[in-house]
Amino acid sequence: MKDKWPTLRICAGLFFGASLVAAQAEETVLERVVVEANRLPDPESAAPFSTHVVDAEELRRAPQLRLDDILRAQVPGFSLFRRSSSRTANPTTQGVTLRNFGPSGAGRTLVLLDGIPLNDPFAGYVLWSQVPPASIDSVLVSPGGGAGLFGNAALAGTIFLVSKPLNATSASVEGSIGNDDTYEASLEATIVQRPVAAAVFAEWFSTGGYPVIAPDQRGPVDEHATSDSNLVDLHAEWQISDNTSLRLQGRRFEDDRGNGTALTQNSTTGHDISAVLTHKFPAQRGELQVSAYGQGRRFRSTFSSVNAARTVETPALDQFNVPADAAGGSAVWSMIASEHRIVLGGDARWMEGKTNERFLWNGTTFRRLREAGGAQVFAGLFAEDTWSLSSNTTIVGGFRFDHWELFDGFRKETERATGSILTNSRFADRTGDELNGRLGLRVKPTDALALRGAVYTGFRVPTLNELYRPFRVGNDITEANAALKPEHLLGGEVAVEWQASQTFRLSGTGFLNRLEDAVSNVTIGVGPGTFNPGGFIPAGGVLRQRRNVDLVVAPGFEATSEWQLIPALSLRGGYLFTHPTIERAAEPALRGKLLAQTPEHVFTGGVEWKPTAQWLVSAQVRYSDRQFEDDQNSRVLAPFTTVDVALRYDFSARGSAAIRVENLLDTEIETGKSADGLISIGPPRQVSLQVRWQL
């Protein structure tokens, strides 16, 4: 048996080693040097890579309740696997992608909260209910860039979530009530008694939801998709000395959902702990940051089969226990040397998980039991130099080396009544080494104009979920594939940024990505019939398996603009064009097809009007082009346009009230279409009243 705790050992060594260094370091402050070793991109610097920023005030003004909905409305390249909001969507469909680069349940984007990964250790998705907007100070979205400083999970980009700083003693409460029995309440309290500060954030959310099947197709078995969640986040900071600080954080959350019928539910519980030690070296104009974390997840999900008339529902799959755990850490050194900002470091992450599920319903009980899972380890070293050749020219160059391992992979199936073993597969351990890099240039020929370009490579090893766990949506089944190979990216982009004045900004970015061995859900059978793998597929159902597609080429163009017409009125717009096409595949029918779940055109726009100091009116519009539901491009999801609005009144310096309306026009959004034509839909009009008070 392979050592299952390598990352914990690495993290412990890094953390306590850095603690010793910090304790022995000189504490005399020579000068204040603002250098951060957390790998967070500086949006104000002359970086050659794309960055979108959503600050605390923009989060507060947004008409949307959920963070993913806010980002979807403000960043045209942000999307989840499906069009549904995370408010009621199944967690396994909440994988994040940027620039529509191969949406999947696992996602190809790394999401970090204060430098700690939020991606599920087993499946790669992000459960967005664990990061309510009220707990976040800012969001930085960095599409593209390849492996960059972060490696495996950052193939399509990185999203940085930053918690509110512990600056002063304060407390606030926030609550909202809306249609469809939707309620939300949160409490935030911070105590600052230097050199120590501590904070607690607690949030509770509940919605009665809405029916997820198109109105003319619903039957007696259909009911509302519901959601209930809660979160408690505790963190503390200790300023050990003028140059040394320690941050501790612990989080626990629960999420329970009904998926639209009586027999389909899922639940998630999770807990995270982390520690971050930071020490500044003023004489060297440098900073060392060491972090360590542990994560645990427990997931359960049930699936059913429904007859054509939607009058009878039958249990189909019970994933009754899906545990997953992760541990990791990093050590990052950053320093300024003349015209160079240098970042050096290493990180590691260990993940283990398995699925325990009952399947093959015989009319009374599930006949069979399946167990499947495994473990992964990633360890990487990276270096990057940002070189300011002049006030107008910046070059960024870096590389990253990663070592990865897959081990203890297995799949076992037994007859529950007799205990007889039907399948007992042990998958070969695998290892690999990856070397990636990126190079970027930014030039300002004039004060108003900036030009930038970048090339980069990246990779992604399939998640444990993709390798070992099947899933079901209605009568459609997707099988796992333990033989999946890692994906590899070669990408590049060029951009023009024009700031005509302090009140007008326009940027455009053209990009081209080549993804080899892209993991995709490939159709291998149509029901009714019995298939291997997959078993029996009912009429109207489709069997897919996760497989590597040889080559996907994804050209695209992204544009953003901001215009402050007058101090009280501002406009914002964004546009994304993408055309991700399968160029080579083992299955001839896939060649020339667009990737599923990728609209070619997405437009976002917003307007804010502040007629007085107390009143704020905001409106946002989003258009998404048609997209294909399946890999065969045979099922089309219709285009849609949504409008969200908000009216806020600040009745004092401490308090405000807001009316928010999402999907003002009550647009029917097609989120899924099965082989037999059954259409799933997104949320209808959502109206809520929110009150916030600073105590």
Q: What feature does the model see in each segment?
A:
Residues 388-391, 395, 403, 507, ...:
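Gram-negative outer-membrane beta-barrel transporters
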Residues 241, 293, 339-343, 347, ...:
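Structural signature of Gram-negative outer-membrane beta-barrels, strongest in the C-terminal barrel
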